[in-house]
Amino acid sequence: MKKLLAAFIISLIAAQIHAADKSLLDAAKAEGKASFYANITAVEPIMKAFIADTGVKAEYTRISTTKFVATAVTEFEAGKFMADVVQAPLPVLELLKGKGMLAAYRSPAAAGYPDWTRKDDRIQLFGIEYVALIYNKELVKKTDVPRRYEDLTDPRWRNKIVMADPGTHPTTISWLIGLKENVFKSEAEWMKFLRGLAANKPMFVASFGPTPAPVESGEKLIAISMPKYIVTKAPAPLDWARVEQPMLGTPRAIAITSKAPHPNAAKLFMDYWLSKKAMDVLAKEVGEYVLAPGVFPPIEGISSAKVVAIRELSDDEIQKWGNQFKKIFDVR
């Protein structure tokens, strides 16, 4: 009798969930589309899958991390913010939350994610913007591949490194502070590393996006960048250095906007984005490090790598350290 009752309850709950899903889908279809502002790149496979599976149109607007807050806040204050869903590094969404730009929504699709990924009812973490040393495996000998972050200070890499601007790129600023707090034993050791890296005269670009190209071409040999490009730039001769220290990264977050023009489509899109199907696509086709249990990108060695989510920096900290790094790296 108890088994029959349990089975009945389970079937009833399943029916309710199905009805809720259909209701949301119907409402989203009536709204017509979901607008997605994101700093993440190469997400077209998920956008296409969402459209095919739901019949709801999805529009993707890519905004670089350095311009995200300014663009979003300016549009919001002018009453022209058209995003239904926003995705960016956690510090960026925390800033938007502080401006009242995010709505409360706890997606059922994230029920299996680790508890620490739910910051609150407004922000859900789904991945880590992992940063590593990416090198040209055809031009760098295996014996020369860095084994520690400190190896970047070796004079052999002078004028051979490319990285996002440490004075303005929030994720790079956070990564450098992450090294200070998670890798180096003292501030003196960390400062020695910074000055040694700066002495090697890295090329600075606006964000991670442009970092692989100079390494692919051989103009530079190493990029402080993301392993995902090994997937998205294949068959380019890229590999990542298996350094002894942990790989660090800023948590990637997603949220619905407080004045979403299409609120039901926004919920449907966020649910889809956090689903295992979408996370599989994000990992396997885009190379992202996601937080859905058991899902990893098809990059040799990544599934066993130690990846540490570094803490979020406040806007004041980003500005403070960005200004200091401009001086250390002589950014002009």
Q: Language-model features: where?
A:
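Short, polar/charged alpha-helical segment
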Residues: D21-K57, L133, K284
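Extracellular/periplasmic bilobal clamshell ligand-binding domains
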Residues: A278, P297-R332
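Bacterial N-terminal signal peptides
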Residues: A6-A15
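A ligand-binding cleft/hinge motif common to bilobed small-molecule-binding domains
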Residues: L90-L95, E216-D239
